[in-house]
From Swiss-Prot:
Could be involved in insertion of integral membrane proteins into the membrane. Disulfide bonds: none annotated. This is Putative membrane protein insertion efficiency factor. PANTHER family: MEMBRANE PROTEIN INSERTION EFFICIENCY FACTOR-RELATED (PTHR33383:SF1). It is found in: Cell inner membrane. One of its GO terms (cellular component) is plasma membrane. Pfam families: YidD. It is a peripheral membrane protein. The keyword Transmembrane helix does not apply. SMART domains: Haemolytic. Residues 62-83 are annotated as: Disordered. Keywords: Cell inner membrane, Cell membrane, Membrane.
Amino acid sequence: MNIVPILLIRFYQSFISPLLGPSCKYHPTCSNYAIEAFRQHNFFYASWLTVWRVLRCNPFSKGGYDPVPPKSVKSAGNSKDSK
């Protein structure tokens, strides 16, 4: 798990976000989205997802429900039918 980025985001949620007020147009909020991304994906992909989400959270976006994409499931065996 990516504990350091999650702790930094929790710090932001506890001490900085209350001063700024609610402003995220998405559900889950951008900071909760980032925490989920770091829980589900590696550091680099989670960082990319977080940056892309924050860039999309702007006055010109509609917002709405935008969950973290799930980890892709790779097939464990041969996909051909054996006969």
